[in-house]
Each structure stands twice: as structure tokens, then as C-alpha cells.
Amino acid sequence: MSVSTASTEMSVRKIAAHMKSNPNAKVIFMVGAGISTSCGIPDFRSPGTGLYHNLARLKLPYPEAVFDVDFFQSDPLPFYTLAKELYPGNFRPSKFHYLLKLFQDKDVLKRVYTQNIDTLERQAGVKDDLIIEAHGSFAHCHCIGCGKVYPPQVFKSKLAEHPIKDFVKCDVCGELVKPAIVFFGEDLPDSFSETWLNDSEWLREKITTSGKHPQQPLVIVVGTSLAVYPFASLPEEIPRKVKRVLCNLETVGDFKANKRPTDLIVHQYSDEFAEQLVEELGWQEDFEKILTAQGGMGDNSKEQLLEIVHDLENLSLDQSEHESADKKDKKLQRLNGHDSDEDGASNSSSSQKAAKE
């Protein structure tokens, strides 16, 4: 379904015009789950269709528990089941992912900051050093106890088991091993803050550079509710002289609270945005070559989401038959922090912790 309007088309033309008038400029992208929904991957927070909504009717203590490190320690099976469905290789990149690859090929891509854990930016061909996965990914694994790093195959091999009978444990400390996905209660990777510190300084340098070769940078935010900090703070920290673009179905975050005169707002699906921007830039032929070489995009089917919910529902029903009400109550109390003197300690620093977009 298209949501294009005359105003969105005009905004896309302005983006293309900015890039054409600054031929040596580079672009920073900040993206969220909205760029992957056309691939069949659910986002987390959309009412009625998001992953949390579809998990809400299951027997988990609360939907977000599947990404809770404490719950994972007590019961890894729900996450293993979900990971089996979401694991890289089950989905193909969208047109927007290939737009990132096109920008890289045109040497105008500075960085992609992504909240997504699906690694579809990598699958589309974007180089590792241009991607900052703020909430981690399946690209490697680590022990939740001592931090020892493991190759992803160690975890993936367990997902091939049917049914999953045991879990990967560290050969050093014996704790569980999981993909390097940031769970609730875990810090974001150091690369996130370190790279953004350098890139924000780079932005300031570029807007003060004068000369014969215009290179005013551009920051494009796509497919995110900007509801999760610290990622949501990035648009706020963009220097005021840098043009910001938001492509999203709704105006969100700092674009809504503190809209700047130079901001461009595009209410559009990310794939439509990619198509129109490529057309305005005159890059259709190169874009088609990328799409052809990669064998096409992910489809728009929601069948994968239904399979995820079905598998988790069966898992939860099976668990409920073998778990006493008393055990459930104790588990829920522990997760809510009622058996700890440090109840609420994590909340005091929650703005610095990661959550899923």
C-alpha cells in the first residue's frame, strides 16, 4: 500500500537536490525495525502487529521477557525458539537495504546506525566497518557470565536440533552463551558511543568546512519510533546546521518535539522512499543492477510472523502443563525484583540500558 502524497514527493525531491548540490557529501543513516517489516520480520511496538503484541497472549510472564537476561538465565528455551525463526538466512533484504548498498557503491555512505538485530544490512552488502549495530546482532556470540566470545556456529548448531534439548554453555565458567544481542538490563556495545562521538565531531567539522567543493552532510532517520534511549537521542545530538530527514509513517521523537526549520519529514514506507529517491537521483540503472545481482528482495508475506507466534504458543502451552502455579509465582516475583534488596537499582540507570525497538 502506498502512502505517497504530493508533500512527501516534494520532500524526496529536496533530499535529492541537496545531494546533487553537495556532490562530495556523505550521508549517515539511522534506522529501525520499519526497514525490515516488508521482509516479513515483525517490528516490536506497532499496535496490533508488533512482536510484543503477538507475544502478549502467550504464557510468558510478560512479552518482553523473551529479551530479558534474567528470564533467559532461568528459561532459555523461548529465546532459542524465537531465535530459530529470526536467525539470519531466513529473510532477504528489502529495497531499502539495497539503497544502503547503492549509497556505499556511490561512495556517499558515511555510516549506518541500526537498531535491528537481523543483519540484513550486512546481507545486502554493506561493509562491516560502515555498520553500527546499536542493539547487537547474531553476528557473534558471547558468554553472559565471563564474556568469552564464541563463533555464531556454536549457537546456530543448537537451533538445528528438533526439539531443542540443551543449551550452549561456556567452557570456562559454565554460564549460558547467547548471541551478542543486547537484552534488557545489558549495556549497549562500546562501539556505539565511541563511533557516534567520532561521527558527531565529523559532522561539526563538515559544516564548518568552506571551499570550492560543497560537502554539507545529511542525516536520514528511517523506520523507527525513536522510543528507545540512548539510540533515540541521536537525532537530538545532530548539529543544528546539519539537515535532518525523517522517513517514517508518523512524526516521532525530536522531529516532533523540537522540529527544526531545515528538517524534512517524509511520511512513507521505507521501500517506497528508496524507489523515489533513486529515481530523483537518476540512479535507477545502478539500483536495478544491485537488485538483479542479489536475486531480488524479501517478500511482503506475514507468514513468517505467524510461524513465530505459532511455535512460541505451542512452546508456552507445553511449558504450562509441566510448571506448577507456585513455580510460576516464584519466577515472576524474582523477575520483578521482589526477592532482592536491590529492587529498582536497574531502573535508576534504565535510560542508559538497551531495549528493543
From Swiss-Prot:
Its EC number is 2.3.1.286. Present with 5260 molecules/cell in log phase SD medium. PROSITE patterns: SIRTUIN. Keywords: Acetylation, Cytoplasm, Metal-binding, NAD, Nucleus, Phosphoprotein, Repressor, Transcription, Transcription regulation, Transferase, Zinc. Changing I117 to F/V: Near wild-type activity for deacetylation. Increases slightly the KM for NAD(+) to 25 uM. One of its GO terms (cellular component) is nucleus. NAD(+) binds at residues 32-52, 115-118, 223-225, 248-250, 270. The active site is at H135. NAD-dependent histone deacetylase that is involved in nuclear silencing events. Derepresses subtelomeric silencing and increases repression in nucleolar (rDNA) silencing. Its function is negatively regulated by active nuclear export. Binds 1 zinc ion per subunit. Residues 317-329 have a biased composition (Basic and acidic residues). Belongs to the sirtuin family. Class I subfamily. Its cofactor is Zn(2+). Homotrimer. Monomer. Homotrimeric in its unliganded state. Undergoes a trimer-monomer transition upon acetyl-lysine substrate binding. GO terms for biological process: negative regulation of mitotic recombination; rDNA heterochromatin formation. The modification N-acetylserine is found at S2. It catalyses: N(6)-acetyl-L-lysyl-[protein] + NAD(+) + H2O = 2''-O-acetyl-ADP-D-ribose + nicotinamide + L-lysyl-[protein]. It comes from the Eukaryota. This is NAD-dependent protein deacetylase HST2. It is found in: Cytoplasm; Nucleus. Coiled coil: none annotated. Its main location: cytoplasm. Residues 5-284 form the Deacetylase sirtuin-type domain. The modification Phosphoserine is found at S340. PANTHER family: NAD-DEPENDENT PROTEIN DEACETYLASE SIRTUIN-2, NAD-DEPENDENT PROTEIN DEACYLASE SIRTUIN-5, MITOCHONDRIAL-RELATED.
